[in-house]
UniProtKB/Swiss-Prot annotation:
EC number(s) on file: 3.-.-.-
Keywords, sorted A to Z: Hydrolase
Organism: Staphylococcus aureus (strain bovine RF122 / ET3-1)
Disulfide bonds listed in the record: none
Protein name: Uncharacterized hydrolase SAB1253
Family statement: Belongs to the peptidase M20 family.
Family matches, as InterPro entries: Amidohydrolase, Bact_exopeptidase_dim_dom, Peptidase_M20, Peptidase_M20_dimer
Length: 383
């Protein structure tokens, strides 16, 4: 089959069989079977995900990463290859990322067989980008200890940019993503004896109001930060004073100082609840993803490789507010660079955003991705 047939076949198979973070068992088996067919050795440091390696003609070692997990979303695309898993969908394009890396593996194996693979290459089929911090898990598991990786590259499909556009930015290209949760515990009573209880209902209203004001009163208005409330609940019945409350959301910032401000304000809010309502309140923060930092030292190589892949380069003036665990590679492993590849095509109706039930794209864009990867490989220079 030709390369367009290759990416169409594999991407649509993966699209039909999406799996959630840390449950990508069939996806992992599919990738392993593909690698076995090429007689390529690989490791599985975690229960899901695969790390493959090909030795080249030089001592330099570079890595390419694709995430393989999906999202708990019911697909609404009316296509023959729609998800066969109820309420699970590749709504972030990871099926495309995985497919592009598979084709690149095949190209690299062909080069190795002919004695023309210029560098050593590590292929990272990474699980759990969406919720499990798979990149950090792999690093902590020692998945890369035996590879002297000098640089890590990755891409993400981007329905906000047209086909043929590559979006880049030095330094921060995505925001940090930190989850927070408030837990409230009061004292229940019948609504007729409301004064006998300690209501988490009113206390939760206070928390909601105060969180909503953090961005307005405590953060620089010229910076794009997000303090988002995603879900909240108080009580169980309409005629009782609620004895419990819960609220959760996410924080997106570009620098550690702003994140510290938000965390400190949330801690003060939690402390104020006890004083005002006699309700115990605790706030907890889940380990988040740091900002993705693109190494400026890799910029020239990235731009040249994109242009040679017939992609028009757009230098984004501000970072995306997405969270992305590719950030851990640049933070802990090696200089890294992350590129967004445009997939928007209004004529074909490919216009909906990431994490939506109608996300779709033309597989031909994946050929551009692989050309970009190969250009990087052929012209890589140590930084």
């Amino acid at each position: 089959m030709n390369e367009l047939e290759f990416v169409t076949k594999h991407r649509r198979h993966l699209h039909q069989h999406p799996e959630l973070s840390l449950h990508e068992f069939e996806t992992t088996a599919y990738i392993k079977a593909f690698l076995d067919s090429l007689n390529i050795k690989y490791d599985c440091p975690l229960e899901t995900g695969v790390i493959a390696y090909l030795e080249g003609n030089d001592s330099h070692t570079i890595a390419y990463r694709a995430d393989i997990d999906a999202l708990p979303i019911l697909e609404e695309n009316d296509v023959p290859y729609r998800s066969q898993s109820d309420h699970v969908m590749h709504a972030c394009g990871h099926d495309g990322h995985t497919t592009a890396l598979m084709l690149f593996v095949q190209r690299c194996k062909d080069m190795q067989d002919s004695g023309q693979l210029p560098q050593n290459v590590v292929f990272i089929f990474q699980p759990a980008e969406e919720t499990g911090g798979g990149a950090n898990r792999l690093i902590k598991a020692g998945a890369f200890d035996k590879y002297p990786i000098e640089a890590v590259f990755g891409i993400h499909v981007n329905p906000f940019a047209d086909e043929g556009i590559a979006v880049i930015r030095d330094e921060e290209i995505t925001a940090s993503a930190t989850e927070y949760r408030f837990f409230l515990t009061g004292l229940s009573s019948h609504v007729a004896d409301k004064e006998q209880g300690h209501s988490c209902g009113e206390a939760l209203q206070h928390v909601l109001t105060q969180i909503s004001q953090i961005q307005q009163f405590h953060l620089n208005g010229l910076k794009r930060n997000i303090v988002h409330i995603g879900h909240f609940k108080a009580g169980e019945a309409i005629n009782t004073v609620p004895s419990n409350g819960y609220l959760e959301g996410t924080i997106r910032t570009y620098d550690i100082d702003d994140l510290t401000i938000v965390k400190n304000q949330m801690q003060k809010i939690a402390e104020s609840v006890k004083l005002l309502f006699n309700v115990d309140c605790e706030v907890k923060f889940a380990e988040g993803y740091p900002p993705t930092i693109n190494s400026p030292k890799l910029r020239t190589q990235i731009e040249d490789a994109l242009i040679k892949a017939d992609l028009n380069v757009y230098d984004k003036p501000t970072p995306f507010l997405f969270g992305e665990d590719f950030s851990f590679y640049g933070q802990q492993l090696a200089p890294a660079y992350f590129v967004f590849i445009g997939t928007r095509n209004e004529d074909k109706g490919f216009v909906t955003g990431l994490h939506t039930s109608h996300l779709n794209f033309d597989e031909k864009v994946l050929i551009n991705v692989v050309n970009f990867y190969e250009n990087l490989l052929n012209n890589y220079k140590e930084v």
